[in-house]
């Protein structure tokens, strides 16, 4: 067995304490070729004899540039040389859209996790990523769910309880630690030149805004943002748990709709969480704050009041004691 470094032991401790992985599991590693995913793959491989995992690897080539395609070819050769079961997915040429690219990557991860019967998908996100995500979403005005979105584990597809678990074993490490680990183990990291392009807001946040905040406001900025995310995560989990109980009282699947009286009597935070969950069942993407608030306003509105149209053409409408979803193709029906 390979001798484990202090970094190996920290990751193994996180896996055990947070129950991220179990012995003997089949794991899919999301592998970009950068320092974080190389560190993740190396650490999991070194822990493999102790945990008896079966490790599979997926690399996604977005075809944004010739450099990225060259990276995919290099990594495929390296993975073959290492004898690791792997696949490389190549996207149709798409415009630079981080949200669209992320959705495509997660679709591929879900597909290959099912193909290889993997119970867990591991990504190389670090505490540095978590801090950036927290600040980025805060600047965009997102709610608690967005601020704590980069957590240790969740379902790969949050709408599908049969999907694999998405786990982030490196979330306790910083980016400089994975950089040093790759240097120590002489891992052939492929530098992603697109990460230096300041035309993209997330890059500017990482390269300019966060260093400025560290220098002038808090040298321990990453630790502070991670601490805030951890505290907020516990509060958000409480709201979600209480909203799940309220959901059983208000949801009318046959309509589909929500009963107004018990929902209106609940605290606003629970109203919003239930409305968010309801709209998430109906819309192609998670609802925005404005879309949730449009539903909340109907809890006190008169009968036949309705929301603006949602994506896809449907809307919410007050019918009797319920706020119901009306599909664009659904015929009108009289409800007193």
Curated annotation (Swiss-Prot):
Keyword Ligase included in the entry's annotation: yes
User: For this UniProt entry, what is the primary localization, expressed as one broad class?
Assistant: cytoplasm
Reactions the enzyme catalyzes:
cytidine(34) in tRNA(Ile2) + L-lysine + ATP = lysidine(34) in tRNA(Ile2) + AMP + diphosphate + H(+)
Q: Which Pfam families match?
A: ATP_bind_3
Superkingdom of origin organism: Bacteria
Annotated GO biological process: tRNA modification
Protein localization: Cytoplasm
GO CC terms of this entry: cytoplasm
Species annotation: Synechococcus sp. (strain JA-3-3Ab) (Cyanobacteria bacterium Yellowstone A-Prime)
What family is reported?
Belongs to the tRNA(Ile)-lysidine synthase family.
Domains as described in the record: The N-terminal region contains the highly conserved SGGXDS motif, predicted to be a P-loop motif involved in ATP binding.
Q: Does the keyword Calcium apply?
A: no
Q: Which GO terms describe its molecular function?
A: ATP binding; tRNA(Ile)-lysidine synthase activity
What this protein is reported to do is described as: Ligates lysine onto the cytidine present at position 34 of the AUA codon-specific tRNA(Ile) that contains the anticodon CAU, in an ATP-dependent manner. Cytidine is converted to lysidine, thus changing the amino acid specificity of the tRNA from methionine to isoleucine.
Q: Which residues bind ATP?
A: 32-37
Write down what this protein is called. tRNA(Ile)-lysidine synthase
EC number(s) on file = 6.3.4.19
Q: Which UniProt keywords apply?
A: ATP-binding, Cytoplasm, Ligase, Nucleotide-binding, tRNA processing
Enzyme class per UniProt: ligase
């Amino acid at each position: 067995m390979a001798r484990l470094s202090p970094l190996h032991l920290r990751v193994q401790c996180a896996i055990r304490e947070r129950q991220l992985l179990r012995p003997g599991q089949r794991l899919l590693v999301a592998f970009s070729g950068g320092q974080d995913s190389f560190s993740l793959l190396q650490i999991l491989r070194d822990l493999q004899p102790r945990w008896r995992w079966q490790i599979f690897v997926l690399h996604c080539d977005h075809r944004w540039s010739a450099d990225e395609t060259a990276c995919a070819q290099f990594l495929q050769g390296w993975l073959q040389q290492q004898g690791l079961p792997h696949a490389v997915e190549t996207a149709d040429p798409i415009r630079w859209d981080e949200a669209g690219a992320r959705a495509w990557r997660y679709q591929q991860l879900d597909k290959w996790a099912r193909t290889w019967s993997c119970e867990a998908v591991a990504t190389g996100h670090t505490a540095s990523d978590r801090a950036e995500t927290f600040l980025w979403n805060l600047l965009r005005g997102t709610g608690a769910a967005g601020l704590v979105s980069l957590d240790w584990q969740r379902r790969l597809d949050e709408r599908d309880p049969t999907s694999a678990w998405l786990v982030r074993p490196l979330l306790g490490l910083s980016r400089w630690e994975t950089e040093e680990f790759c240097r120590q183990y002489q891992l052939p990291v492929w530098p992603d030149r697109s990460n230096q392009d300041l035309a993209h807001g997330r890059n500017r946040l990482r390269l300019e805004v966060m260093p400025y905040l560290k220098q002038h406001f808090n040298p321990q900025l990453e630790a502070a943002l991670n601490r805030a995310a951890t505290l907020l995560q516990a509060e958000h989990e409480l709201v979600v748990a209480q909203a799940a109980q309220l959901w059983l009282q208000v949801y009318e699947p046959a309509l589909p709709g929500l009963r107004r009286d018990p929902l209106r009597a609940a605290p606003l935070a629970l109203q919003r969480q239930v409305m968010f969950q309801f709209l998430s069942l109906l819309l192609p993407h998670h609802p925005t704050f404005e879309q949730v608030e449009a539903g909340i306003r109907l809890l006190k509105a008169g009968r036949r009041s309705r929301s603006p149209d949602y994506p896809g053409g449907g809307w919410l409408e007050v019918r009797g004691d319920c706020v119901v979803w009306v599909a664009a193709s659904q015929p009108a029906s009289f409800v007193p």
